[in-house]
């Protein structure tokens, strides 16, 4: 791969307003996993939105809401973990719209057959695939990343296999034989996804060091 081509690929990872989607967070939605990666609660604390790249995305979350009980009591309702997959290719904003969940009858119906809407900035529905994430492990705390990886490999209703692939061991990126050398065609997409993900995790100095390294790589 030519260094110039790699640099262009990396440049695509940088935040660009015209190619970003704003996911508006809801106080009644507890986001657990985003695109195969666990979401840190400290990262979301106080935030009302998340910036996403345009393209396919997958959210794993629970609905948490105080509901009315018979006799004027209240309790906290927590839904089973849900998986929502959708595409933001031509969408600049995503908003949650939950159904009415005011009492035990409504939450019981929601548990049995979850439904919700994702709306764009013009309040138009976004096509979404919704499913319940069945937890296979009894371990505590729940490894949501691992559960989502298994789900995405199982061809379920809201599965996105590309996010299961991204959970694979990335040790080869650090080995003597780089994935950047003689990449077979079927690995091109995976490699690009990994580059984008790890580049965005790095601090500005690390990004700059990587770009300098890329410029020095010989043409293949």
UniProtKB/Swiss-Prot annotation:
Residues 1-20 form the signal peptide. The keyword Signal applies. The keyword Signal applies. It holds the Pfam family DUF2057. Keywords: Signal. InterPro entries: UPF0319 (IPR018635). It comes from the Bacteria. Belongs to the UPF0319 family. PANTHER family: UPF0319 PROTEIN YCCT (PTHR38108:SF1). This is UPF0319 protein YccT. The lineage of its organism: Bacteria, Pseudomonadati, Pseudomonadota, Gammaproteobacteria, Enterobacterales.
């Amino acid at each position: 791969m030519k260094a110039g081509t790699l640099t262009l690929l990396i440049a695509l990872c940088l935040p660009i307003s015209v190619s970003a989607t704003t996911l508006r967070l809801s106080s009644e939605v507890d986001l657990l996993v985003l695109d195969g990666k666990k979401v840190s609660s400290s990262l979301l604390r106080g935030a009302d939105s998340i910036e996403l790249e345009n393209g396919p995305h997958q959210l794993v979350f629970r609905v948490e809401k105080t509901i009315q009980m018979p006799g004027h009591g209240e309790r906290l309702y927590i839904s089973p973990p849900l998986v929502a997959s959708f595409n933001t290719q031509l969408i600049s904003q995503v908003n949650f719209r939950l159904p009415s969940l005011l009492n035990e009858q409504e939450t019981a119906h929601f548990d049995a057959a979850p439904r919700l809407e994702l709306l764009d900035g013009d309040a138009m529905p976004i096509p979404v695939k919704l499913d319940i994430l069945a937890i296979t492990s009894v371990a505590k705390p729940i490894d949501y990343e691992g559960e989502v990886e298994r789900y995405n490999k199982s061809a379920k209703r809201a599965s996105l296999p590309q996010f299961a692939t991204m959970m694979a061991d990335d040790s080869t990126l650090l080995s003597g034989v780089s994935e950047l050398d003689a990449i077979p065609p079927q690995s091109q997409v995976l490699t690009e996804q990994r580059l984008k993900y790890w580049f965005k995790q790095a601090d500005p100095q690390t990004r700059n060091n990587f770009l300098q390294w890329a410029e020095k790589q010989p043409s293949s």
